[in-house]
C-alpha cells in the first residue's frame, strides 16, 4: 500500500501502471476509485476525464464512488426567461451544527458550449439583518481570496470560480454571508456547485430573487464523472443498528429506511452522456477493518464492533457508511464476473446492470432514475449474464475445469455452470452416506442453471455433490 494525494497526474500515472501490468499478464483489470469533489463542469470533458476515459475505451473498467453529499444543497441552476434578468446565489455561512465555514467555494458553469460570454457576474456581501447587498471593491475581494472568470478551452463553456476566506470577508459577523449576482439574457442557463466544506446554497428569509439550492447533478468530479466509469451510489442494506465492542450497547447510525437509497448518497443526473449513478450497492453501516495507525483511531470509538488478535497484534473492525463502502462491493462483483468472462467491456458491464439490476418499491420501478441508476446490484444474476456474454467459439469447448457456482437460498441450492459440460450428476446425501436426492443433466451449456429443492428434507446436515466430466464439487448443506 502506498500513500496518494489523489492529484490528477498521480491518478493517471497509477492507472497507466495498472493497465500496463494487466496487459503484460494478459488479464483484465478493474480499479476502485473512492474520491472526488464538486469542482468541475460535471460533463466528463476535462482533459483528466478524457485521459482516464481512454483506458475504459481500451477495455479497462473503472468503478467510482458518487460521493456522500446527498443530504446537502451543494447545487443550484437557473434558466433566464427574459433579457437582462438577474438572479442571486446565497451561500450559508455555517454548517447544520452551527460550526462556521472557514471558506466558501463556488464553481459556476454555463450550459452552452459556444465559447461566448452569456453572463455578467458580481460577488457581494449580504447582510441578513438589513437585507442589503454590498458589492465591495476589487481590492476587497482580492484580500478575501480569488474570483476568476474564463472560457474553458476543453469544453468551450463560460466558467467562474469563487474561493473566499470566510473570516476575512465577514470579520466574524455571522449576519454577513457570501452571494453572487448573475445577470443573463433570455434562454441562457447555468449550473453552480459549492464544494463540500465550502458552503451550501439557500434562500435567506426576505432576500430578493434567489436561485433554489438542491442536491441534484452531484456526480463526483475526478472519478464518477469519467464518461465510461461505473458510478456507484449507496442503499441501506440493514436497519442501521449495531452493537458496539466498547460498551456492548446497541447504537443506530441510520441513513434512512432499510432498502431505500442512503440519504447521504449523491444523486444525478449527469451532464454528460451516461447514466450516473449507474448502480447502487449496500453502503450504510458496513463492517470493515479499521486502520489502527490512523491519527484519529481510538479504542474507545463506539463504532468499533469486533477485534481479532494475531500474535501480539490486535486488529479492529467497525462500522462505516458512504458510497466508498458501496463501491468496493461493485468492484469485487465485477472482478468475479471477469473471472467468468475476462472479455467483458465497460459497455458489457452496463448491459448486465441494465438486464439484471433489482428494482423495488423502495427505489422505484422505472428503467433508470437519478438516485439509483439501473437499480440494486445482483451479483449472482449478473454472473449468469457474464457467463452468457462469451465470444463466438467458446460454445464449442466442453468439459472445462471452470468451477461451478452455488447459491444457497432459504429452501434450495441454485447451481450455475461456468462452462459447457457433457453431463452433470447431482446428488444429496445424509452425513451417514444415504442418498436422499439426485438429478442428472446432459448437454449443459455455459450459463445453464440447475435447482435442487431442499424443502422436503428433515432438518439436519446434508452433503451435496456435483460431478461433471472434469470437475467434482462437494458442499455441506444445513436444513433448518
Locate predicted features.
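Short acidic, glycine-rich surface-loop motifs adjacent to enzyme active sites
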Residues: 3, 19-42, 65, 181-185, ...
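Hydrolase catalytic cores
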Residues: 1-8, 12, 16-24, 105-113, ...
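Extracellular/periplasmic catalytic domains that process cell-envelope and extracellular macromolecules
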Residues: 23-25, 55-57, 222-227, 270-274, ...
